[in-house]
């Protein structure tokens, strides 16, 4: 089983190499530096699904909020 969490992109750290693209992502106020190499089209304000430090997809705000509610109900 793997756990991937939604977070909101709060800043991008530009890099000329898209494989090294990183950004700051907020998880309920906890800010982490995350690799955005798999989602190079991401923008500040977007929600991403993050697994082991890598954003693996972009999701809309509604889907992110639903996931956060589900996780809270499970006590995660």
Swiss-Prot record:
It comes from the Bacteria. Gene3D superfamilies: 2.30.30.140. One of its GO terms (molecular function) is carbon dioxide binding. Pathway: Protein modification; [NiFe] hydrogenase maturation. InterPro entries: Hydgase_assmbl_chp_CS (IPR019812), Hydrogenase_HupF/HypC (IPR001109). GO terms for biological process: protein maturation. Involved in the maturation of [NiFe] hydrogenases. Involved in the biosynthesis of the Fe(CN)(2)CO cofactor. Belongs to the HupF/HypC family. PANTHER family: HYDROGENASE MATURATION FACTOR HYBG. This is Hydrogenase maturation factor HypC. It comes from Synechocystis sp. (strain ATCC 27184 / PCC 6803 / Kazusa).
